[in-house]
Amino acid sequence: MSWRGRSTYRPRPRRYVEPPEMIGPMRPEQFSDEVEPATPEEGEPATQRQDPAAAQEGQDEGASAGQGPKPEAHSQEQGHPQTGCECEDGPDGQEMDPPNPEEVKTPEEGEKQSQC
């Protein structure tokens, strides 16, 4: 004889989520990248908008003018600490992808490859 008890499953009541209210009609101008800035109101000061990339460029030029050239080769060495085995580095200093296991030939007992 099998015991037949009451099911404990109870479906959750469905909740109705109201859609967000529309403030006004949606215009394509609102989504354009080249929208003219709105005119400032009486209480707001007038500001000039600049391209963020151009503003960043101007800041970079002023900061690097007094420092001289950046040592690029030295900064790359700091990013990759030396482990004592540089066999993975390619001729240009970038790491090479590991070889395809299907293409790798197993060395014979007499031959030994350097392993890192």
Swiss-Prot record:
Protein name: G antigen 2A
Pfam families: GAGE
Extra remark beyond the main annotation: This gene belongs to a multigene family expressed in a large variety of tumors whereas in normal tissues, expression is restricted to germ cells. These genes organized in clustered repeats, have a high degree of predicted sequence identity, but differ by scattered single nucleotide substitution. Their sequences contain either the antigenic peptide YYWPRPRRY or YRPRPRRY which is recognized by cytotoxic T-cells.
Basic and acidic residues bias (residue ranges): 102-116
Signal sequence region: none
Family: Belongs to the GAGE family.
Tree of life domain: Eukaryota
Positions of region (Disordered): 1-116
Listed Acidic residues bias regions: 31-44, 86-95
